[in-house]
Amino acid sequence: DFVPGILIMVLFVFSDMLDGTMARMQNRTGVWGAFLDSSLDRVADGVIFGSVLICAVRTQSVGVQAAAFVCLVGGFLISYARARAESVGLDCKVGIAERTERLLILLLPAFIYGLGVPYVLPAALYVLAVLVLITVWQRFAHVYRQANA
Protein backbone atom coordinates (compact mmCIF):
# COMPACT_ATOMS: atom_id res chain seq x y z
CA ASP A 1 0.00 0.00 0.00
CA PHE A 2 1.06 3.53 -0.75
CA VAL A 3 0.29 5.16 2.63
CA PRO A 4 2.32 2.75 4.82
CA GLY A 5 5.20 3.01 2.35
CA ILE A 6 5.17 6.80 2.53
CA LEU A 7 5.02 6.72 6.33
CA ILE A 8 8.05 4.41 6.41
CA MET A 9 9.91 6.76 4.04
CA VAL A 10 9.07 9.75 6.25
CA LEU A 11 10.36 7.84 9.29
CA PHE A 12 13.66 7.06 7.53
CA VAL A 13 14.07 10.64 6.25
CA PHE A 14 13.39 12.04 9.72
CA SER A 15 15.85 9.63 11.35
CA ASP A 16 18.46 10.55 8.73
CA MET A 17 18.09 14.23 9.59
CA LEU A 18 18.20 13.43 13.29
CA ASP A 19 21.44 11.43 13.18
CA GLY A 20 23.36 14.31 11.58
CA THR A 21 21.99 16.75 14.13
CA MET A 22 22.89 14.44 17.00
CA ALA A 23 26.44 13.97 15.68
CA ARG A 24 26.92 17.75 15.44
CA MET A 25 25.51 18.31 18.93
CA GLN A 26 27.94 15.76 20.36
CA ASN A 27 30.89 17.07 18.31
CA ARG A 28 31.24 13.63 16.72
CA THR A 29 31.36 14.73 13.12
CA GLY A 30 34.15 13.68 10.82
CA VAL A 31 35.13 13.23 7.21
CA TRP A 32 34.04 9.59 7.08
CA GLY A 33 30.67 10.36 8.69
CA ALA A 34 30.03 13.21 6.27
CA PHE A 35 30.96 11.03 3.29
CA LEU A 36 28.81 8.14 4.50
CA ASP A 37 25.85 10.41 5.27
CA SER A 38 25.95 12.03 1.83
CA SER A 39 26.27 8.66 0.12
CA LEU A 40 23.35 7.17 2.04
CA ASP A 41 21.30 10.29 1.26
CA ARG A 42 21.78 9.53 -2.45
CA VAL A 43 20.69 5.93 -1.89
CA ALA A 44 17.58 7.11 -0.04
CA ASP A 45 16.80 9.65 -2.76
CA GLY A 46 17.22 6.98 -5.41
CA VAL A 47 14.86 4.62 -3.61
CA ILE A 48 12.25 7.31 -2.98
CA PHE A 49 12.26 8.93 -6.42
CA GLY A 50 12.86 5.60 -8.17
CA SER A 51 9.78 4.17 -6.43
CA VAL A 52 7.72 7.14 -7.57
CA LEU A 53 9.05 6.70 -11.10
CA ILE A 54 8.06 3.01 -11.07
CA CYS A 55 4.59 3.98 -9.81
CA ALA A 56 4.32 6.61 -12.55
CA VAL A 57 5.34 4.12 -15.24
CA ARG A 58 2.63 1.74 -14.05
CA THR A 59 -0.21 4.22 -13.53
CA GLN A 60 0.46 7.65 -15.02
CA SER A 61 0.78 9.46 -18.34
CA VAL A 62 4.05 9.88 -20.21
CA GLY A 63 4.23 13.49 -18.99
CA VAL A 64 4.08 12.44 -15.35
CA GLN A 65 6.65 9.73 -16.04
CA ALA A 66 8.96 12.33 -17.59
CA ALA A 67 8.47 14.65 -14.60
CA ALA A 68 9.35 11.80 -12.21
CA PHE A 69 12.46 11.03 -14.28
CA VAL A 70 13.52 14.71 -14.22
CA CYS A 71 13.08 14.72 -10.42
CA LEU A 72 15.21 11.59 -10.04
CA VAL A 73 18.08 12.60 -12.33
CA GLY A 74 17.90 16.30 -11.46
CA GLY A 75 18.05 15.52 -7.74
CA PHE A 76 21.28 13.61 -8.26
CA LEU A 77 22.65 16.42 -10.42
CA ILE A 78 21.83 19.02 -7.76
CA SER A 79 23.80 17.04 -5.18
CA TYR A 80 26.65 16.29 -7.57
CA ALA A 81 26.98 19.94 -8.62
CA ARG A 82 27.44 21.01 -5.02
CA ALA A 83 29.91 18.22 -4.23
CA ARG A 84 31.94 18.87 -7.36
CA ALA A 85 31.98 22.64 -6.82
CA GLU A 86 33.13 22.19 -3.24
CA SER A 87 35.83 19.74 -4.37
CA VAL A 88 37.41 22.52 -6.46
CA GLY A 89 37.07 25.10 -3.69
CA LEU A 90 33.87 26.84 -4.79
CA ASP A 91 30.68 27.49 -2.84
CA CYS A 92 27.43 26.00 -4.13
CA LYS A 93 24.84 26.38 -1.38
CA VAL A 94 22.24 27.94 -3.67
CA GLY A 95 18.95 26.85 -5.18
CA ILE A 96 15.26 26.93 -4.44
CA ALA A 97 14.82 23.15 -4.17
CA GLU A 98 17.35 21.71 -1.73
CA ARG A 99 16.96 18.09 -0.63
CA THR A 100 14.59 18.80 2.26
CA GLU A 101 12.29 20.87 0.07
CA ARG A 102 12.30 18.22 -2.65
CA LEU A 103 11.36 15.50 -0.18
CA LEU A 104 8.58 17.56 1.40
CA ILE A 105 7.17 18.53 -2.00
CA LEU A 106 7.10 14.84 -2.94
CA LEU A 107 6.19 12.94 0.23
CA LEU A 108 3.19 14.98 1.42
CA PRO A 109 1.40 14.80 -1.96
CA ALA A 110 2.37 11.12 -2.26
CA PHE A 111 0.70 10.48 1.10
CA ILE A 112 -2.44 12.34 -0.03
CA TYR A 113 -2.35 10.41 -3.32
CA GLY A 114 -2.28 7.20 -1.30
CA LEU A 115 -5.44 8.32 0.49
CA GLY A 116 -7.24 8.39 -2.86
CA VAL A 117 -6.73 11.90 -4.27
CA PRO A 118 -5.37 10.98 -7.72
CA TYR A 119 -4.32 14.37 -9.12
CA VAL A 120 -2.13 15.50 -6.21
CA LEU A 121 0.97 13.42 -6.96
CA PRO A 122 1.11 14.22 -10.70
CA ALA A 123 0.69 17.93 -9.95
CA ALA A 124 3.46 17.79 -7.33
CA LEU A 125 5.78 16.00 -9.76
CA TYR A 126 5.24 18.67 -12.42
CA VAL A 127 5.94 21.46 -9.93
CA LEU A 128 8.93 19.63 -8.48
CA ALA A 129 10.41 18.94 -11.92
CA VAL A 130 10.32 22.67 -12.69
CA LEU A 131 11.89 23.52 -9.32
CA VAL A 132 14.59 20.89 -9.83
CA LEU A 133 15.48 22.30 -13.26
CA ILE A 134 15.60 25.84 -11.83
CA THR A 135 17.86 24.65 -8.99
CA VAL A 136 20.22 22.91 -11.42
CA TRP A 137 20.40 26.11 -13.47
CA GLN A 138 20.99 28.21 -10.32
CA ARG A 139 23.86 25.99 -9.20
CA PHE A 140 25.51 25.90 -12.62
CA ALA A 141 25.18 29.69 -12.98
CA HIS A 142 26.52 30.28 -9.46
CA VAL A 143 29.56 28.06 -10.02
CA TYR A 144 30.17 29.57 -13.47
CA ARG A 145 30.21 33.10 -12.00
CA GLN A 146 32.65 32.07 -9.26
CA ALA A 147 34.92 30.18 -11.65
CA ASN A 148 35.10 33.15 -14.02
CA ALA A 149 35.38 35.93 -11.43
Question: For each predicted feature, which ranges?
Answer:
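Hydrophobic alpha-helical transmembrane segments
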Residues: 1-3, 13, 47-149
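Basic, amphipathic juxtamembrane/active-site segments
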Residues: 6-10, 20-66
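Conserved G/P- and acidic residue-centered "switch" motifs that form tight phosphate/ATP-binding loops
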Residues: 16, 37, 75
